[in-house]
């Protein structure tokens, strides 16, 4: 006998398909926001029935990373929210590394950042500080990338150590 897919199974498959589409669109929106293509990011976000509010927040915080000063706006700490905060922190790192550093520890404990995301945020903070020859760059880089997996970070760390004449490190 030919097995026909029941209504419940169809509904389940469709729901799963929509979920995949949402996550696919959400990741495209994140890439667009990272590339500063806010028009594309916004149009993708509008097509996200389940994640549109969080998607809009991601695009907003990418453009106005100061919004991170109010952590209550970024709750609950879902995966989409963690993406928004991560992107915001990387933007903030370039504008105001001190503020980004202060916020990173708090957000790192409440958000679900992947190890790579933490390294990526710390890298932005560290590199911005390193370009200003600020020795705190070393602490940030060492704390979040102790294995020095990131080559750019390793190079800047070395330059900074030489510049600051800290031979023992």
Predicted regions: what is each one?
Residues 1-169:
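Alpha-helical solenoid repeat scaffolds
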């Amino acid at each position: 006998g030919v097995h026909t897919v029941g209504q419940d199974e169809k509904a389940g498959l469709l729901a799963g398909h929509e979920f995949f589409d949402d996550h696919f669109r959400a990741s495209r929106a994140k890439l667009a926001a990272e590339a500063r293509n806010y028009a594309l990011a916004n149009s993708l976000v509008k097509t996200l029935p389940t994640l549109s509010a969080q998607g809009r927040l991601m695009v907003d915080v990418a453009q106005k990373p100061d919004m991170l000063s109010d952590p209550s706006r970024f709750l609950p700490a879902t995966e989409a929210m963690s993406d928004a905060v991560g992107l915001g922190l990387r933007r903030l790192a370039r504008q105001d590394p001190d503020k980004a550093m202060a916020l990173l520890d708090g957000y790192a404990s409440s958000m679900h950042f992947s190890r790579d995301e933490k390294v990526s945020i710390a890298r932005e903070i560290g590199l911005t500080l390193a370009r200003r020859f600020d020795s705190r760059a070393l602490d940030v880089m060492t704390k979040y990338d102790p294995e020095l997996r990131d080559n750019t970070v390793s190079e800047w760390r070395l330059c900074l150590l030489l510049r600051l004449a800290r031979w023992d490190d």
